[in-house]
Curated annotation (Swiss-Prot):
The keyword Signal applies. This is U1-lycotoxin-Ls1ee. Coiled coil: none annotated. InterPro entries: Spider_toxin_CSTX_knottin, Spider_toxin_CSTX_Knottin_CS. It is found in: Secreted. It comes from Lycosa singoriensis. GO terms for cellular component: extracellular region.
Length: 110
C-alpha cells in the first residue's frame, strides 16, 4: 500500500512538472508570436503610403488591398534643364487589372 501511495505521489509530481514545462513552452510561443506581430506592425508603420515619394527608399512601399505597392520612377526635367529621377509608390497596371477581376469575382460570386 505504501508503495502504491509513493508511486502515485511520484506520478502526480512528474505530471505536474511536465505540464508546467508544456505551459512554459506555450507561453514562450505566444511571446514569440506577439513579438513578430509587433515587428510587422512597426514595419507597416514605417512603410511609404500610396502616391508618396519613395526616391530614397525604393523598397519601402506599403501593401495595398491585394499586392504591395511598387516604387514607380520617372525622369523629370527641372526649370534649369537638369534631369532628376522622381519616384512614387503606386499600383502597377497588371496589379490594377488583377484587383479589378477579383472585385468583379467577389460581386458575382458573393
Amino acid at each position: 500500500m505504501k508503495f502504491v501511495l509513493l508511486f502515485g505521489v511520484l506520478l502526480v509530481t512528474l505530471f505536474s512538472y511536465s505540464s508546467a514545462e508544456m505551459l512554459d513552452d506555450f507561453d514562450q510561443a505566444d511571446e514569440d508570436e506577439l513579438l513578430s506581430l509587433i515587428e510587422k506592425e512597426e514595419a507597416r508603420r514605417d512603410c511609404i503610403p500610396k502616391h508618396h515619394e519613395c526616391t530614397s527608399n525604393k523598397h519601402g512601399c506599403c501593401r495595398g488591398h491585394l499586392f504591395k505597392y511598387k516604387c514607380q520612377c520617372t525622369t523629370v526635367v527641372t526649370q534649369s534643364g537638369e534631369e532628376t529621377e522622381r519616384c512614387f509608390c503606386g499600383t502597377p497596371p497588371h496589379h490594377k487589372a488583377a484587383e479589378l477581376v477579383v472585385g468583379f469575382g467577389k460581386k458575382i460570386f458573393g
